[in-house]
């Protein structure tokens, strides 16, 4: 089981790096000409939560790559460093995905869409996606990718723990 658990952990660590970079790229390229006169276009840079998302995804990719390196090259000597990097990566990814999902849900209120302050208004207006569909699609896609990255780092940590369980 030790070799299989190590392989699974390494697979998911590699997946975290790729998914974090993909989430950051999808969000960083999200922009659309806005159909109403709210400044001409909407971009991720107009929302502090989306900027946080991009920064958090990039930092989590770096942390995950460092944890991957330490897991492969210096496995025995860097156990505490890998654990710290894993915690930072999980915290950044879960908080970034949560922030994007929250902003996506509350965007009609922020933009002053008519009727958005009522439950019926939010349903009829289709949240933010009603006004800027392509932008919303990219934002939602990047948040989903980020959530998968957070789940992948969780699996990597759990399989690493399963690998060390029998050694004590």
Swiss-Prot record:
UniProt topological domain (Extracellular) ranges: 28-49, 102-138
Highest rank taxon of the organism: Eukaryota
Side of membrane Cytoplasmic, spans: 1-6, 71-80, 160-168
Coiled-coil intervals: none
Cellular compartment(s): Cell membrane
Topological type in the membrane: Multi-pass membrane protein
Keyword Membrane: yes
SS bond list: none
Pfam family, one: CASP_dom
Subunit annotation: Homodimer and heterodimers.
Annotated NCBIfam families: A_tha_TIGR01569
PANTHER family membership: CASP-LIKE PROTEIN 1U1 (PTHR36488:SF8)
Protein name (database record): CASP-like protein 1U1
């Amino acid at each position: 089981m030790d070799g299989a658990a190590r392989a699974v952990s390494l697979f998911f660590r590699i997946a975290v790096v790729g998914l974090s970079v993909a989430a950051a790229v999808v969000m960083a390229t999200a922009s659309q000409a806005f159909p109403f006169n709210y400044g001409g276009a909407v971009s991720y840079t107009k929302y502090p939560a989306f900027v946080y998302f991009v920064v958090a995804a990039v930092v989590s990719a770096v942390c995950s790559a460092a944890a991957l390196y330490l897991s492969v090259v210096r496995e025995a000597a860097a156990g505490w460093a890998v654990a710290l990097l894993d915690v930072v990566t999980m915290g950044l990814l879960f908080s970034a995905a949560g922030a994007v999902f929250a902003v996506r849900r509350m965007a009609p209120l922020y933009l002053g869409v008519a009727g958005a302050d009522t439950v019926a208004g939010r349903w009829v207006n289709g949240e933010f996606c009603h006004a800027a569909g392509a932008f919303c699609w990219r934002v939602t896609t990047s948040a989903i990718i980020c959530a998968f990255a957070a789940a992948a780092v969780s699996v990597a940590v759990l399989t690493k723990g399963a690998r060390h369980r029998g050694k004590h």
